[in-house]
Amino acid sequence: ASNRGVPCSFYRTKDPIHGPYEEIKGTMEYWDPNLFLDDDGRMYFYWGCDNRTPIWGVELDPQTMSPIGEKKDLIKGNPWSRGYERFGENHSENPRSEAEIDVCFAKFLEDCGERAKDIPKENYDMIRTTFANLPYIEGAWMTKHDRKYYLQYACPGAEINVYADGVYI
């Protein structure tokens, strides 16, 4: 379960097939999550799915599922230095400048018969950013192999031929 704008609950059980499941009320909102239990018993939580925000991580208390400390920015999209994060067929599109975004956004508003001042601020930023050609950083997944940690993620967008996986070791 995940939700933007609303704290999300966790569910746990000792028997995933038959249950019962216990709901643990959430204390934070998240989208596209991954839960990682390290072999030392510490639990970590990773999430993010956006072209405006990073993949975050935080340690969780395994009993309460509450964060221990503050969330940390772990991976931010950077199509200028990681070419596999560039949009477009065959990674052919660079991020747009603010002026180019303004032109695309104005055309979108005109085509929809909308006025910028009538769009709520949270929707305005989200819609406008879709024209930036910035990569969607999503699908965080932590793996440990031979005492090394691999934080994997997907980008730039599932709708094009160059959907890719990146990894930080």
Where are these regions (language model features)?
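Carbohydrate-active catalytic/glycan-binding domains of CAZyme proteins
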Residues: A1-I169
